[in-house]
C-alpha cells in the first residue's frame, strides 16, 4: 500500500506501508534504515559519500550513490534529516545530520499513521 501523507506543515511524504514487516522495516528499505542509523548514531554531519560508503560496508550487495542521495534529500524534505551546505572543489555539497532521534522518529511516524487511520 502506498500512502501520500500530508504533514501539518504541508509537506507530503510518500510512504509504502508493508504490514508484513515490523518497526522501521514497515516504511523503509534496508539501505535507508542503515543510512538513518548512521546519522542517529553520530554527532557529525556526514556527506552523501560518507553515508554511501558506510552503508555499502554494512549491507550485502551494492547500493548506488544516487539511491543514497535521493533518500537523504527526500528525508530532508520530509523533516527527518537536516543539512548544512558547504563549498568544495565541485561546488556546493550537503552534509547531513538527523533532525530527530531514533525514538523521536518512531513517535513521529507513529503519530502520522495513527492520524491517517482515524480518518477511515
Q: What residue spans do the PLM features occupy?
A:
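A short, conserved structural fragment
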Residues: 76-87
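Short, cationic-aromatic polyanion-contact patches
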Residues: 86-107
Amino acid at each position: 500500500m502506498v500512502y501520500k501523507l500530508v504533514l501539518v506543515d504541508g509537506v507530503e511524504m510518500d510512504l509504502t506501508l508493508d504490514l508484513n514487516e515490523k518497526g522501521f522495516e514497515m516504511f523503509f528499505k534496508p539501505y535507508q534504515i542503515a543510512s538513518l542509523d548512521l546519522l542517529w548514531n553520530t554527532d557529525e554531519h556526514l556527506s552523501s559519500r560518507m553515508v554511501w560508503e558506510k552503508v555499502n560496508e554494512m549491507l550485502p550487495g551494492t547500493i548506488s550513490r544516487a539511491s543514497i542521495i535521493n533518500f537523504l534529500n527526500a528525508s530532508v524534505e520530509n523533516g527527518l534529516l537536516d543539512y548544512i551546505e558547504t563549498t568544495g572543489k565541485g561546488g556546493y555539497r550537503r552534509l547531513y545530520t538527523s533532525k530527530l532521534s531514533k525514538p523521536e522518529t518512531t513517535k513521529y511516524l507513529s503519530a502520522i499513521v495513527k492520524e491517517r487511520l482515524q480518518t477511515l
